[in-house]
Regions:
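Basic/aromatic recognition patch in beta-strand/loop cores that engages polyanionic ligands
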Residues: 51-85
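Basic side chains
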Residues: 40-42, 54, 69, 93, ...
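Basic, Lys/Arg-enriched alpha-helical interface segments
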Residues: 1-65
């Protein structure tokens, strides 16, 4: 039996990555920076294949009850779920850390 987890992205998380790239490349006019930033995010997400629960749970609802973890990467925060039975990690969302993330999540209930 392997100790590694399969890591995947939700549709929302993939959209978040596209939006992050688009904003940095097109609004800030820094496509190289956008590519590098996505590379750093993806590298950290890939590292969740081993001991994914090492990062803390969020402390606000409803995500705390869902056992949502958060992983900071530069100015961004990756939110993900761990399924120990399936040995799987699913990245749920990726947000810029300066946003009111709790407010965004709770407004989408």
């Amino acid at each position: 039996m392997t100790d590694s987890y399969k890591v995947g992205y939700s549709v929302d998380a993939l959209d978040d990555l596209r939006e992050i790239y688009s904003y940095i490349a097109n609004e800030l006019l820094a496509p190289e920076t956008a590519t590098a930033q996505l590379g750093r995010i993806r590298k950290e997400v890939r590292s969740l294949d081993f001991m994914p629960a090492r990062y803390t749970l969020v402390d606000w609802e409803p995500w705390h009850s869902m056992k949502m973890h958060h992983l900071p990467v530069d100015n961004f925060i990756v939110y993900y779920l761990v399924d120990d039975e399936k040995r799987a990690v699913t990245v749920a969302r990726i947000f810029y850390g300066g946003r009111d993330i709790e407010g965004i999540i709770n407004s989408n209930k």
